[in-house]
Structures are given as structure tokens and as C-alpha cells.
Amino acid sequence: MVQEQDTPWILSTGHINTQKGEDGQQTPKLEHRNSTRLMGHCQKTMNQVVMPKQIVYWKQWLSLRNPILVSLKTRVLKRWRLFSKHEWTS
């Protein structure tokens, strides 16, 4: 198995994500407000993208359901007409 080594990039960026506390210990930095805003914006954008897809899926589902209901109605009407014709002729 390959052992992970600290590359210069990891070493150079490692200090960005940590900060030294008053006692000298390194703690994770809190996210910057702009990055939090950006994440919120990304989530809103994704929600706006997902919402029309959900609407399309619902419309597709409804269009699938409606032909079934229509075909059932058509079948019932045809049978009723055949039945009533048969009743009238006999």
C-alpha cells in the first residue's frame, strides 16, 4: 500500500486551514463569511435547477397516470355501449 506523504502543496496550504489559539494550539479556522455566502448561493442555485426537474417529473408522472385513467374510462364506456346495445337488440 502506498503511504501518503505531505507534498509541498499540502505543506504550503496546511497553515491556511488552521489558526493558532491563545494557548498556542492549532485549531481549525472558521469559514470566511464570503465562502459561507458562496455555499448558500450554490445551494440556492442547485435548488433552482432541481425544482424544474421535479416539476417535469411530476408532469410526466401525471401524463402517465392520465392515459391510464382515460383508457379505463374508454373501456368502461365501450363495454357499457356494447352492453346497452345488446340489451336493446335482445
Curated annotation (Swiss-Prot):
InterPro entries (alphabetical): Flu_proapoptotic_PB1-F2 (IPR021045)
Sorted UniProt keywords: Apoptosis, Host cytoplasm, Host membrane, Host mitochondrion, Host mitochondrion inner membrane, Host nucleus, Host-virus interaction, Inhibition of host innate immune response by virus, Inhibition of host MAVS by virus, Inhibition of host RLR pathway by virus, Membrane, Modulation of host cell apoptosis by virus, Viral immunoevasion
Region annotation Mitochondrial targeting sequence: residue ranges? 65-87
Which residues carry the site feature described as Low pathogenicity?
A: N66
Q: Where does the record place it?
A: Host mitochondrion inner membrane; Host nucleus; Host cytoplasm, Host cytosol
Q: Name one Pfam family in it.
A: PB1-F2
Which GO BP terms sit in this record?
Answer: symbiont-mediated perturbation of host apoptosis; symbiont-mediated suppression of host cytoplasmic pattern recognition receptor signaling pathway via inhibition of MAVS activity
What GO terms fall under cellular component here?
host cell cytosol; host cell mitochondrial inner membrane; host cell nucleus; membrane
How this chain assembles, per its entry, is: Oligomer. Interacts with human SLC25A6/ANT3 and VDAC1. Interacts with host MAVS.
- Function text: Plays an important role in promoting lung pathology in both primary viral infection and secondary bacterial infection. Promotes alteration of mitochondrial morphology, dissipation of mitochondrial membrane potential, and cell death. Alternatively, inhibits the production of interferon in the infected cell at the level of host mitochondrial antiviral signaling MAVS. Its level of expression differs greatly depending on which cell type is infected, in a manner that is independent of the levels of expression of other viral proteins. Monocytic cells are more affected than epithelial cells.
Family membership, please give it.
Belongs to the influenza viruses PB1-F2 family.
Other notes on this protein?
Is not encoded in all strains, and seems to be dispensable for replication.
Which HAMAP family did the record assign? INFV_PB1F2
Q: What is this protein called?
A: Protein PB1-F2
Native source species: Influenza A virus (strain A/USA:Phila/1935 H1N1)
Organism phylogeny: Viruses, Riboviria, Orthornavirae, Negarnaviricota, Polyploviricotina
Point out the gene that encodes the protein.
Answer: PB1
